[in-house]
């Protein structure tokens, strides 16, 4: 979980109940489900060091109703909401093992608990070198409470595609790039080149590899992808076989003002990387895109869609004599990335509020960083070239609901302890994001969370004309850039 880069603030956070400070009162707690893990918690929760008063087990087995397990009463519940019983008994804490209850029941229970200021804990095995292992408690993190299913790469063919290969990750010190590098580093590549223009984050990822994956042969290159001469030295030196191109600028309002940087990095940086990959015979090129590339209303989204189209054009061009497999992966917001709304809300809660939300109806798709990167790697392994892969991101989440949930997780009451203030949509922002245009269709893959978008190939002549025009970037006004992007980017309707 530390790879995700953030923790939810909670009023009382602890990992080992035996290390908790003694307090003058004990909060009541109930355990949901009678199973070996939960039964082993009884000793911890009833010890003299515990901060809790264990009231009961609550179980779906009606045969256990009124009986005792490990000296603790068991309540069997029926259709009546569990929270109603918890409120009646004044129980402010529960222990819940994810997956114990049917998914819908579990979701409703967690939602009800959050709305009623009842804290939800999960059992966790505490390893102790001096004594026998013991069960203890840990709070759920936000990803778990958003009901994101954990994804594991279990297909050995996926790992085999990257083993003993020379892999380049651009933007390798960023939120997505660094996680891609960490996951790929565990696949035993021949060499892993992590490239970024940000010095401090690149140093931090270097320290991570030295400490956690010392067996991986890594190289850390401080290079700007828009500098052709410097970038080419990396290709000439290492001869990468696989490229994950994650280098990009992503913040919508900032790039509306700094539109030339969006074009320079997101479009020309991608073009340079593609040209070098073609020149040096790279086998596979994976472009990391965004759902903001679909029907964009801002320059950032339009630049990312243009970059996707550059990949499609390069795949079909005559220069692709080595049949380099070029593909794009498209997904939504990631939890805990640099500058994400979750990090912002966390800071605002810590400061006592208010939490700022742009609009009461704005909603977004969310994924965890590890989840997104695992799907990128899986798509990269299955891709034969020319595809745009879309990920199943579950249901979209209203940002105001996310804000309220985080406030309650912090033990506060929304709009009482911490205010929520609506500030208005920023330039280029939409109420909702899409992963597919209305006219496009999808094709399934062997992975249930990955589909292929069926989209028309861009007009090569128009692409080349626009690239020539954009070469004059330093002399272009924002309006001129927008007019050029509108000629080629499907569905681009600037917010003005």
Give short role names for the model-derived ranges.
Residues 86, 90-92, 189-190, 235, ...:
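Proline-aspartate-enriched helix->loop->beta-strand connector
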Residues 157, 313, 317-496:
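Strand-loop microenvironment adjacent to phosphate/nucleotide-handling motifs in alpha/beta enzyme folds
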Residues 222-242:
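Conserved Rossmann-fold cofactor-binding substructure of NAD(P)-dependent oxidoreductases
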């Amino acid at each position: 979980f530390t790879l995700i880069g953030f923790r939810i603030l909670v009023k009382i956070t602890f990992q080992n109940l035996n290390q908790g400070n003694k307090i003058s009162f004990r909060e009541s707690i109930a355990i949901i489900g009678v199973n070996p893990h939960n039964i082993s918690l009884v000793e911890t929760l009833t010890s003299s060091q515990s901060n809790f008063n264990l009231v009961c087990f609550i179980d779906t087995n009606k045969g256990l109703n009124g009986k005792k397990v490990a000296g603790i009463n068991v309540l069997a519940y029926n259709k009546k909401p569990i929270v109603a019983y918890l409120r009646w008994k004044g129980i402010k804490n529960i222990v819940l093992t994810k997956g114990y209850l049917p998914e819908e029941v579990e979701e409703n229970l967690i939602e009800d608990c959050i709305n009623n200021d009842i804290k939800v804990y999960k059992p966790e095995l505490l390893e102790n070198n001096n004594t026998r292992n013991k069960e203890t408690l840990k709070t759920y993190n936000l990803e778990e409470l958003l009901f994101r299913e954990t994804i594991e790469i279990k297909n050995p063919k996926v790992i085999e595609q990257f083993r003993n290969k020379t892999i380049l990750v651009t933007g390798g010190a960023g939120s997505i790039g660094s996680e891609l590098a960490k996951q790929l580093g565990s696949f035993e590549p021949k060499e892993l080149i992590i490239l970024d223009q940000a010095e401090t984050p690149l140093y931090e990822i270097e320290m991570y590899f030295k400490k956690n994956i010392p067996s991986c042969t890594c190289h850390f290159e401080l290079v700007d992808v828009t500098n052709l001469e410097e970038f080419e030295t990396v290709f000439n030196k290492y001869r990468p076989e696989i490229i994950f191109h994650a280098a990009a600028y992503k913040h919508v309002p900032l790039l509306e003002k700094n539109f030339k940087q969006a074009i320079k990095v997101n479009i020309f940086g991608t073009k340079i990387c593609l040209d070098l990959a073609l020149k040096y015979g790279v086998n596979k090129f994976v472009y990391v895109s965004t759902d903001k590339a679909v029907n964009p209303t801002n320059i950032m989204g339009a630049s990312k869609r243009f970059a996707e189209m550059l990949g499609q054009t390069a795949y079909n061009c005559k220069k692709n004599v080595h049949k380099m497999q070029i593909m794009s992966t498209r997904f939504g917001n990631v939890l805990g990335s640099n500058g994400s709304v979750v990090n912002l809300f966390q800071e605002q809660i810590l400061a006592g509020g208010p939490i700022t939300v742009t609009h009461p109806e704005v909603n977004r798709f969310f994924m965890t960083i590890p989840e997104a990167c695992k799907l990128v790697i899986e798509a990269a392994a299955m891709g034969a070239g020319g595809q745009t892969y879309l990920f199943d991101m579950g249901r979209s989440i209203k940002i105001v609901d996310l804000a309220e949930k985080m406030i309650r997780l912090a033990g506060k009451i929304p709009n009482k302890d911490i205010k929520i203030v609506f500030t208005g949509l920023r330039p280029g922002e939409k109420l909702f994001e899409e992963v597919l245009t209305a006219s496009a269709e999808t094709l399934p893959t062997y992975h249930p969370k990955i589909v292929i978008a069926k989209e028309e190939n861009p007009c090569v002549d128009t692409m080349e004309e626009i690239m020539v025009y954009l070469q004059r970037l330093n002399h272009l006004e924002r309006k001129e850039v927008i007019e050029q992007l509108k000629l080629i980017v499907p569905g681009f309707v600037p917010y003005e």
